[in-house]
Amino acid sequence: MSHNHIQLNTIEEAIEDIKAGKVVIVVDDEDRENEGDFIAAAEKVTPELINFMATHGRGLICAPLTQKRCKELNLHPMVTNNTVLHQTAFTVSVDLIGNGCTTGISVHDRAKTIEALIKEDTKPEDLGRPGHIFPLIAKEGGVLRRTGHTEATVDLARLAGLKPAGILVEILNEDGTMARLPQLVEVAKKWDLKIISIENLVAYRMKHDSLIEKKEDFEIDTRFGKFRLRAYQQNTNKQVHIALTKGDWNSNEAVLTRINSMLGNNDILDALSGKLDIRIEAAFNKINEEGKGAILFINQEEVSSSLLKRLSIVKENDGKLDLDTPKLTADQKDYGIGAQILHDLNISKIKLLTNSEKTKRVGMTGYNLEIEDYIQY
């Protein structure tokens, strides 16, 4: 497949190289970081591999790990309030204590530290903090949740049949500037490396995996009129997400769409009881004016199993439900889950109802979603 008309390798080819202990280059969306990273599996780490990454990558060598592994090693987030643009989930940096390690910065020491991060008998106290290796917490669900190099690294290792952990480093040009796609292609040729895109990795995984399962599908009467409600349960954490749609469309049609960052539990109940946030009320009105469209409620609650029970009551009572539920603080929208829901709704082109154009665009093309227009409201 190609990226900006440049021929890239297939995901299958990259998986085979990761399995063989080789380095691959992974590029992301030009609307995101527009960078390339050297990526390898942690299980295949050697001092020589670290030296190659440090010498020819020139960026910061990091070790993407699963949330589960980070908890096992007591690797807490580096900061309590992550304000970096794409919320890369750095933990406190580490060095392996002892085992022949001294300063922690040599390629030997860094390779040993990465080995320790995936060894089952490594204990939290075996790791000195801070150190010279920077673990990254990958989102559960991988690139289907977040189109980042962190998730791509863990996904590729897992797809190669290895432990879900890896090594990455950003690739810089010799003058210290970021290497963009044309330079990355030359780097790949020079070192005979495979080069793939996160966009293609997402497409590969969407063909083979799904993070959602439809649990409910029925017509519902709201104060904004009749809508079709679909409830989806996320298999990584059992959260329940809601899609409310009006009208019909074909697969090539750009559909008016709002991806809502508030909580599904509260939003759907407030839609029925008349206590809905004014911005979402405006979205309903826009869709009614259009005659068709979709509103997604991406649930941010830790536990949302009760939502399916509540929706069952809503269905049985024709939408006559008045429950007073507490408001919870929402995190950023989960566009990976939203993308899978949109694909299930036969939506690939959207007219996005939004107030902040730039942040909505980040990473979206990786999910094969084309934003044809931004509708301000």
Name each model feature, range by range.
Residues 1-377:
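Catalytic domains of riboflavin
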